[in-house]
Curated annotation (Swiss-Prot):
Function: Together with its co-chaperonin GroES, plays an essential role in assisting protein folding. The GroEL-GroES system forms a nano-cage that allows encapsulation of the non-native substrate proteins and provides a physical environment optimized to promote and accelerate protein folding.
Name the UniProt record assigns to this protein: Chaperonin GroEL 1
Keyword Nucleotidyltransferase belongs to the record: no
Binding locations of ATP: T29, L30, G31, P32, D86, G87, T88, T89, T90, G413, D479, A480, A481, D495
Keywords: ATP-binding, Chaperone, Cytoplasm, Isomerase, Nucleotide-binding
First-tier enzyme category under EC: isomerase
Recorded superkingdom: Bacteria
GO MF annotations in UniProt: ATP binding; ATP-dependent protein folding chaperone; isomerase activity; unfolded protein binding
Pfam families the record matches: Cpn60_TCP1
Localization, UniProt: Cytoplasm
One biological process term in Gene Ontology: protein refolding
Enzyme Commission number(s) from the entry: 5.6.1.7
Length: 545
């Protein structure tokens, strides 16, 4: 495939053009009075969104070079989304402002490498300052404020997420599901819950609700497939003598063994229920070990030299109550805190050591099931389009609250960045010289871009509002929803420090890369063939096949 090569100013200008298009599409959503963007979908109804990274992912331009610019700035948004889960629009607006300002200086003859060094040093200074100004999140009121702002000023959502965080703790997991009703509901599960139900509906003890509820049961955990009932007979006899119910968690139970269990259950000889083991492969083994730790039992596995036919009562776990439906199993156990704590600590260390975000997420889920609990928010809405929009907003809100708990909160609405601009200016004048100083000044001028855009989206003059905010104390900023200057902490307009920091770092990184670009190589567009009219081969020429 032939390539097109563009050098110097032309290359940078083409990138800038693509960035302008993307930044404008994303920036319209910024702030409490930001608008929505409608995305056409190949199948199904159009999607209405207010989420920066979702919009950025949709934009593809015809011109390959401009499209490269789009891809670069999109990276700033998605990297921020990966790191903090929110702040994607801010990252896009910041990156765009830095590139605009920087290109002006490069065109005037400044050295891009020196500018990049200045940008990097300024960013490092600002990151330290953001950490200094961050306040730790102590109460659920602050969590509710962060969540409400992130969900588009929805206080009800804020309260719901704060409530969920309260119930499941910092280690807990809050997941989203599409609800069946118009209202958004919160459901918190006590104990460990996994997505496997009973193997046979005959195990249900409550036929009306089709669930099996076993109080004070023994728990047999094994990673092997149970094929012969003879393997189970010794342990079943011991459990029957003890007069307690039994829950079997195994890879699978073949028909013959299953039939025997069902017959015993129906005749009332033994109250028993069987569940397939959750997960796959190594993850299944780890989850079975988690269940064994929680219930103070052992995993009966040949890896440890244990066989089912030799199993003793003291190898079985005990639970306070186990509830099994056709889709999931919930184990509520108590009294084994020490072992559970040690297991949680082990999982935490694994989380710190792993680089894969997927593994991190799965380990976090395991930790939540052991330590805190799991909250499910069922998102309700009148139409599917609204449901998707709400789900995206809620996702942002959950991520923002987690980020706030990690690194604390700072004044929101672009205020922190505007107040840090004079501090950066003074520091740069003292510590930097020449073109590095110009690089720091590029960052300093870009810091006001998010607030300026928030004000413009609210129909105000952005430049005037930025100047007025600069004159006020650090915690005071502009509330675009009410059009007044307020203490941002008192008004509940706060951002997680992690979100502000990630947006700034990723914007500076992309800006530095664009400014130091001297040449672009892209595919040459293929010439379009002009088919003579009506030359559709055999079938009607109007259709795409």
């Amino acid at each position: 495939m032939a390539k097109r090569i563009i050098y110097n100013e032309n290359a940078r200008r083409a990138l800038e053009k693509g960035m302008d298009i993307l930044a404008e599409s994303v920036a319209v959503t910024l702030g409490p009075k930001g608008r929505n963007v409608v995305l056409e979908k190949k199948f199904g109804a159009p999607q209405i969104v207010n989420d920066g990274v979702t919009i950025a992912k949709e934009i593809e331009l015809e011109d390959h070079i401009e499209n490269t610019g789009v891809a670069l700035i999109r990276q700033a948004a998605s990297k921020t989304n990966d790191a903090a889960g929110d702040g994607t629009t801010t990252a896009t607006v910041l990156a765009h402002a830095m590139v605009k300002e920087g290109l002006r200086n490069v065109a005037a003859g400044a050295n891009p490498i020196a500018l990049k060094r200045g940008i990097d040093k300024a960013t490092q200074f600002l990151v330290e300052k953001i950490a200094e100004h961050a306040r730790p999140v102590e109460d659920s009121k602050a969590i509710a404020q962060v969540a409400a702002i992130s969900a588009g000023n929805d206080e009800e959502v804020g309260r719901m997420i704060a409530d969920a965080m309260d119930k499941v703790g910092k280690e807990g997991v809050i997941s989203l599901e599409e609800g069946k009703s118009m209202t958004t509901e919160l459901e918190v599960t006590e104990g460990m819950r996994f997505d496997k139900g009973y193997i046979s509906p005959y195990f249900a003890t409550d036929t009306e609700r089709m669930e099996a509820v076993l109080d004070e049961p023994f728990v047999l955990v094994t990673d092997k497939k149970i094929t012969l009932v003879q393997d189970l007979v010794p342990i079943l006899e011991q459990v029957a003598r003890a007069g307690k119910p039994l829950v079997i968690i195994a890879e699978d139970i073949e028909k013959e063994a299953l039939a025997t269990l069902v017959v015993n259950r129906l005749r009332g000889v033994l109250n028993v229920a069987a569940v397939k083991a959750p997960g796959f492969g190594d993850r299944r083994k780890a989850m079975l070990e988690d269940i064994a730790v929680l219930t103070a039992g052992q995993v009966i596995t040949e890896d440890a030299g244990l066989k089912l036919e030799n199993a003793k009562l003291d190898m079985l776990g005990k639970a306070r109550r186990i509830t099994i439906t056709k889709d999931h199993t919930t184990i509520v156990a108590e009294g084994n805190e020490k072992a559970v704590k040690a297991r949680c600590e082990q999982i935490r260390r694994q989380i710190e050591e792993t680089d894969s975000s997927y593994d991190k997420e799965k380990l976090q889920e395991r930790l939540a099931k052991l330590a805190g609990g799991v909250a499910v928010i069922k998102v309700g809405a009148a139409t599917e389009t609204e449901m998707k929009d709400r789900k995206l907003r809620l996702e942002d809100a959950i991520n923002a609250t987690k980020a706030a708990v990690e690194e604390g909160i700072v004044p929101g609405g672009g205020t922190t960045l505007v107040h840090l601009a004079p501090e950066l200016s003074n520091w740069a004048a003292e510590h930097l010289t020449g073109e590095e100083l110009i690089g720091a000044n590029i960052v300093e001028r870009a810091l006001s871009a998010p607030l300026r855009r928030i004000a413009e989206n609210a129909g105000q003059n952005g430049a005037i509002i930025v100047e007025r905010v600069k004159e006020k104390p650090f915690d005071v900023g502009y509330d675009a929803a009410k059009d007044e200057y307020v203490n941002m902490f008192d008004a509940g307009i706060v951002d997680p420090a992690k979100v502000t920091r990630s947006a700034l770092q990723n914007a500076a990184s992309i800006a530095g890369m664009v400014l130091t670009t001297e040449c672009i190589i892209v595919d040459k567009p293929e010439p379009k063939e002009n088919n003579p009219a009506g030359s559709g081969a055999g079938m009607g020429g109007d259709f795409d096949y």
